[in-house]
């Protein structure tokens, strides 16, 4: 099944057990579980599609927005075709459209399934400091979706080593223009001001202004904001994924080593306050791991399974060494 998904175009594929996903919802208050979708689900096939690194070498964020749209379209097509093939073989299946959310789940701030947590349970990566999923191959520069199936498949093992370098890196924290990166958590409202420039909240703001009479309709309809809203409806461009900074600067993944290490080395947004906060997180982590100090919500007993129960053990350093070795071998193999 995983081989077939890759033949169809998936970059990464993993299998998660529906039973495990039902037992460990990311937020038990708002359970994002397969059983809420179908009581007959046995497995979830998790598909990840990489975002081409070239998008993070551009002068503005606009190319990332367009690439995101294309990546999502490709990924949904891969998952849909796989679901069709499963049904043709006698196994009822359906896909959960990537990035969809449900109003009943915390006013649509959650999807029916958390694709990040699906990826962790399917052995594709672990959550980072900013709670994006970090895959060893592509870091956080991926989108994921889930295919819910009644076929019982052997689940993949979770990665127990923390893929994220963590507090001693803090590059995502340093780069965030909204100061939204918490300690293995995210301030969603702050993040949305940059990541969802033309999202649902901005749309409500536009129409509130019209209803209250505070906004001139003719001016609004000829504004960049209204154009962004229209484009978001057509292509999801601007409605999410606007701000790629935490993705661009993360040093995890061979795509970073190959294409981004030089251009993303310097972080213009980095401030003394960012550095101080990263150091505070590091100190808090040390006391937390020693069983002292206040609890860190993102590292409590429930959430630790998705961060990596073993902590960071140097996976990025090992990966970089292997990348350099392969580069050297390729260079030596090339004819002069």
Tell me what each language-model feature is:
Residues 1-75:
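Non-catalytic, usually N-terminal nucleic-acid engagement modules in DNA/RNA processing proteins
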Residues 34, 280-281:
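FAD-binding beta-loop-beta segment adjacent to the flavin cofactor pocket
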Residues 65, 70-271:
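Catalytic cores of enzyme domains
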Residues 240, 274-276, 311:
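Conserved SAM/AdoMet-binding glycine-rich loop
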Residues 263-264, 268-275, 325-336:
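Compact disulfide-stabilized, cysteine-rich extracellular microdomains and processed peptide cores
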Residues 268-277, 284-294, 298:
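Short, C-terminally biased terminal segments at protein or domain edges
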Residues 287-328:
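Long, compositionally biased charged/polar accessory segments in the mid-to-C-terminal portions
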